[in-house]
Amino acid sequence: TTRRLTAFERQRVLRRISASMAERKEEFARTLAQEAGKPIKGARTEVERAIFTFNVAAEESTRSYGEVLPLDWQEFTAGRWGIVRRFPLGPVAGITPFNFPITLVAHKVAPAIAAGCPMVLKPAPQTPLCSLLLAECVQQAGWPDGGLNVIPLSNEDAGLLVSDDRIKLISFTGSVPVGWDIKRRAGKKKVVLELGGNAAVIVHSDADLSYAVDRCVTGGFAYAG
Protein backbone atom coordinates (compact mmCIF):
# COMPACT_ATOMS: atom_id res chain seq x y z
CA THR A 1 0.00 0.00 0.00
CA THR A 2 1.02 3.63 -0.34
CA ARG A 3 1.70 4.14 3.37
CA ARG A 4 4.36 1.41 3.35
CA LEU A 5 6.50 3.10 0.72
CA THR A 6 9.67 4.65 2.06
CA ALA A 7 10.50 8.31 1.50
CA PHE A 8 13.03 7.51 -1.21
CA GLU A 9 10.48 5.30 -3.01
CA ARG A 10 7.90 8.09 -2.98
CA GLN A 11 10.55 10.51 -4.21
CA ARG A 12 11.43 8.17 -7.06
CA VAL A 13 7.77 7.90 -8.08
CA LEU A 14 7.37 11.68 -8.08
CA ARG A 15 10.47 12.17 -10.20
CA ARG A 16 9.23 9.58 -12.68
CA ILE A 17 5.87 11.35 -12.89
CA SER A 18 7.60 14.64 -13.58
CA ALA A 19 9.78 13.07 -16.26
CA SER A 20 6.81 11.35 -17.89
CA MET A 21 4.86 14.60 -17.99
CA ALA A 22 7.86 16.36 -19.50
CA GLU A 23 8.01 13.76 -22.28
CA ARG A 24 4.29 14.25 -22.97
CA LYS A 25 4.05 17.97 -22.25
CA GLU A 26 2.78 18.90 -25.72
CA GLU A 27 0.06 16.26 -25.41
CA PHE A 28 -0.90 17.68 -22.02
CA ALA A 29 -0.88 21.24 -23.36
CA ARG A 30 -3.05 20.48 -26.37
CA THR A 31 -5.48 18.44 -24.28
CA LEU A 32 -5.72 21.32 -21.82
CA ALA A 33 -6.29 23.85 -24.60
CA GLN A 34 -8.98 21.74 -26.21
CA GLU A 35 -10.97 20.90 -23.10
CA ALA A 36 -10.58 24.20 -21.22
CA GLY A 37 -10.44 26.63 -24.15
CA LYS A 38 -7.18 28.10 -22.89
CA PRO A 39 -4.76 29.53 -25.49
CA ILE A 40 -1.96 27.09 -26.27
CA LYS A 41 0.72 29.46 -24.96
CA GLY A 42 -0.95 29.61 -21.55
CA ALA A 43 -1.60 25.87 -21.64
CA ARG A 44 2.08 25.14 -22.17
CA THR A 45 3.02 27.43 -19.30
CA GLU A 46 0.54 25.67 -17.03
CA VAL A 47 1.93 22.25 -17.89
CA GLU A 48 5.46 23.43 -17.09
CA ARG A 49 4.20 24.63 -13.70
CA ALA A 50 2.65 21.23 -13.01
CA ILE A 51 5.90 19.46 -13.92
CA PHE A 52 7.73 21.78 -11.53
CA THR A 53 5.20 21.01 -8.79
CA PHE A 54 6.01 17.30 -8.94
CA ASN A 55 9.72 18.08 -8.78
CA VAL A 56 9.19 20.19 -5.66
CA ALA A 57 7.09 17.43 -4.09
CA ALA A 58 9.88 14.94 -4.83
CA GLU A 59 12.29 17.10 -2.84
CA GLU A 60 9.86 17.62 0.03
CA SER A 61 9.00 13.92 0.28
CA THR A 62 12.28 13.27 2.10
CA ARG A 63 11.89 16.24 4.48
CA SER A 64 8.98 15.04 6.60
CA TYR A 65 11.06 15.07 9.75
CA GLY A 66 10.04 14.01 13.22
CA GLU A 67 11.41 15.32 16.50
CA VAL A 68 13.40 14.00 19.44
CA LEU A 69 12.41 15.72 22.68
CA PRO A 70 14.19 15.59 26.06
CA LEU A 71 11.79 14.57 28.83
CA ASP A 72 13.96 15.63 31.77
CA TRP A 73 11.56 18.33 32.92
CA GLN A 74 10.23 15.95 35.61
CA GLU A 75 12.25 13.87 38.03
CA PHE A 76 10.75 10.52 37.10
CA THR A 77 11.40 11.07 33.37
CA ALA A 78 15.02 12.19 33.76
CA GLY A 79 17.23 10.52 31.18
CA ARG A 80 14.29 9.69 28.93
CA TRP A 81 13.51 10.97 25.45
CA GLY A 82 10.30 11.36 23.48
CA ILE A 83 10.23 10.55 19.77
CA VAL A 84 7.72 12.20 17.43
CA ARG A 85 7.12 10.49 14.09
CA ARG A 86 4.90 11.41 11.17
CA PHE A 87 2.63 8.89 9.47
CA PRO A 88 0.41 9.11 6.37
CA LEU A 89 -3.04 10.37 7.32
CA GLY A 90 -4.96 8.03 5.04
CA PRO A 91 -7.20 8.44 1.99
CA VAL A 92 -7.51 12.01 0.70
CA ALA A 93 -10.22 13.46 -1.53
CA GLY A 94 -9.17 16.18 -3.96
CA ILE A 95 -11.77 18.37 -5.69
CA THR A 96 -10.49 20.77 -8.35
CA PRO A 97 -11.93 23.54 -10.58
CA PHE A 98 -11.91 24.02 -14.35
CA ASN A 99 -9.71 27.09 -14.72
CA PHE A 100 -6.31 25.45 -14.12
CA PRO A 101 -7.07 21.80 -14.88
CA ILE A 102 -3.53 20.43 -14.53
CA THR A 103 -1.78 22.88 -12.19
CA LEU A 104 -4.40 22.70 -9.45
CA VAL A 105 -4.69 18.94 -9.87
CA ALA A 106 -0.92 18.70 -9.41
CA HIS A 107 -1.25 20.77 -6.24
CA LYS A 108 -3.51 18.03 -4.83
CA VAL A 109 -1.88 14.87 -6.18
CA ALA A 110 1.82 15.64 -5.69
CA PRO A 111 1.64 16.39 -1.93
CA ALA A 112 -0.55 13.33 -1.36
CA ILE A 113 2.05 11.10 -3.01
CA ALA A 114 4.86 12.82 -1.11
CA ALA A 115 3.04 12.08 2.15
CA GLY A 116 2.21 8.48 1.23
CA CYS A 117 -1.55 9.02 1.05
CA PRO A 118 -3.89 7.48 -1.53
CA MET A 119 -6.18 9.96 -3.27
CA VAL A 120 -9.60 10.04 -4.83
CA LEU A 121 -9.56 12.93 -7.31
CA LYS A 122 -12.71 14.57 -8.63
CA PRO A 123 -11.76 16.94 -11.45
CA ALA A 124 -14.13 19.61 -12.72
CA PRO A 125 -16.84 18.13 -14.99
CA GLN A 126 -15.72 20.45 -17.81
CA THR A 127 -12.04 19.39 -17.70
CA PRO A 128 -11.46 15.74 -16.71
CA LEU A 129 -9.08 14.73 -19.51
CA CYS A 130 -5.87 16.25 -18.13
CA SER A 131 -6.48 14.43 -14.85
CA LEU A 132 -6.91 11.13 -16.68
CA LEU A 133 -3.67 11.73 -18.59
CA LEU A 134 -1.92 12.45 -15.30
CA ALA A 135 -3.31 9.21 -13.86
CA GLU A 136 -1.57 7.33 -16.68
CA CYS A 137 1.75 8.94 -15.74
CA VAL A 138 1.20 8.17 -12.06
CA GLN A 139 0.44 4.52 -12.72
CA GLN A 140 3.41 4.11 -15.06
CA ALA A 141 5.69 5.70 -12.44
CA GLY A 142 5.06 2.81 -10.05
CA TRP A 143 2.55 4.31 -7.62
CA PRO A 144 0.53 1.37 -6.22
CA ASP A 145 -2.68 0.40 -7.97
CA GLY A 146 -5.58 2.19 -6.34
CA GLY A 147 -3.29 4.89 -5.01
CA LEU A 148 -4.82 7.47 -7.35
CA ASN A 149 -8.43 7.14 -8.44
CA VAL A 150 -9.68 9.79 -10.88
CA ILE A 151 -13.47 9.80 -10.77
CA PRO A 152 -15.26 12.25 -13.08
CA LEU A 153 -18.42 13.09 -11.15
CA SER A 154 -21.04 15.77 -11.28
CA ASN A 155 -20.62 18.42 -8.61
CA GLU A 156 -23.77 17.13 -6.95
CA ASP A 157 -22.46 13.57 -6.69
CA ALA A 158 -19.19 14.83 -5.19
CA GLY A 159 -21.06 15.09 -1.91
CA LEU A 160 -20.51 11.34 -1.59
CA LEU A 161 -16.81 12.01 -1.02
CA VAL A 162 -17.58 14.51 1.70
CA SER A 163 -19.78 12.09 3.62
CA ASP A 164 -17.67 8.94 3.18
CA ASP A 165 -16.03 8.00 6.49
CA ARG A 166 -13.10 6.35 4.70
CA ILE A 167 -11.89 9.77 3.56
CA LYS A 168 -9.63 11.38 6.18
CA LEU A 169 -8.96 14.73 4.50
CA ILE A 170 -10.72 16.81 1.86
CA SER A 171 -8.72 19.29 -0.23
CA PHE A 172 -11.01 21.62 -2.20
CA THR A 173 -10.31 24.49 -4.58
CA GLY A 174 -13.36 26.40 -5.76
CA SER A 175 -16.07 28.81 -4.76
CA VAL A 176 -16.58 30.24 -1.29
CA PRO A 177 -20.15 28.93 -0.73
CA VAL A 178 -19.25 25.38 -1.78
CA GLY A 179 -16.07 25.38 0.29
CA TRP A 180 -17.77 26.41 3.51
CA ASP A 181 -20.58 23.93 2.85
CA ILE A 182 -17.97 21.16 2.56
CA LYS A 183 -16.42 22.24 5.85
CA ARG A 184 -19.84 22.25 7.52
CA ARG A 185 -20.62 18.73 6.29
CA ALA A 186 -17.16 17.20 6.75
CA GLY A 187 -17.59 16.31 10.40
CA LYS A 188 -14.32 15.09 11.91
CA LYS A 189 -12.45 15.07 8.61
CA LYS A 190 -9.59 17.48 8.12
CA VAL A 191 -10.38 20.08 5.46
CA VAL A 192 -8.07 22.22 3.28
CA LEU A 193 -9.87 25.02 1.43
CA GLU A 194 -8.61 27.34 -1.32
CA LEU A 195 -11.57 29.60 -2.01
CA GLY A 196 -12.48 32.39 -4.38
CA GLY A 197 -10.14 34.93 -5.88
CA ASN A 198 -9.17 38.46 -4.95
CA ALA A 199 -8.18 39.96 -8.27
CA ALA A 200 -8.56 43.66 -7.60
CA VAL A 201 -6.65 46.19 -9.70
CA ILE A 202 -5.32 49.40 -8.17
CA VAL A 203 -3.86 51.99 -10.54
CA HIS A 204 -2.25 54.92 -8.72
CA SER A 205 -2.30 58.44 -10.11
CA ASP A 206 1.44 58.35 -10.81
CA ALA A 207 1.34 55.01 -12.65
CA ASP A 208 2.30 54.43 -16.27
CA LEU A 209 -1.24 54.31 -17.65
CA SER A 210 -0.28 52.69 -20.96
CA TYR A 211 1.42 49.85 -19.10
CA ALA A 212 -1.46 49.56 -16.63
CA VAL A 213 -4.04 49.34 -19.41
CA ASP A 214 -2.01 46.67 -21.20
CA ARG A 215 -1.70 44.57 -18.04
CA CYS A 216 -5.38 44.97 -17.15
CA VAL A 217 -6.47 43.83 -20.60
CA THR A 218 -4.06 40.90 -20.49
CA GLY A 219 -5.19 39.85 -17.02
CA GLY A 220 -8.85 40.20 -17.87
CA PHE A 221 -8.91 38.42 -21.22
CA ALA A 222 -5.81 36.19 -21.49
CA TYR A 223 -7.81 33.02 -20.86
CA ALA A 224 -9.96 33.84 -23.90
CA GLY A 225 -6.99 34.18 -26.25
Label for each model-derived stretch:
Residues 109-110, 158, 179, 213:
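Generic hydrophobic/aromatic pocket-lining and core-packing "Φ" positions
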Residues 1-65:
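Glycine-rich loop-to-alpha-helix module at the N-terminal edge of alpha/beta enzyme cores
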Residues 10, 32, 54, 116, ...:
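Residue-level signal for inorganic ion chemistry
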Residues 169, 177-225:
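ALDH superfamily catalytic-core signature
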Residues 70-78, 150-153, 215-216:
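Short gly/ser/thr-rich secondary-structure transition/capping motifs
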Residues 110, 168-173:
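Periplasmic-binding protein-like
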Residues 81-82, 149-168:
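A structured beta-alpha segment of the ubiquitous adenosine-cofactor-binding alpha/beta core
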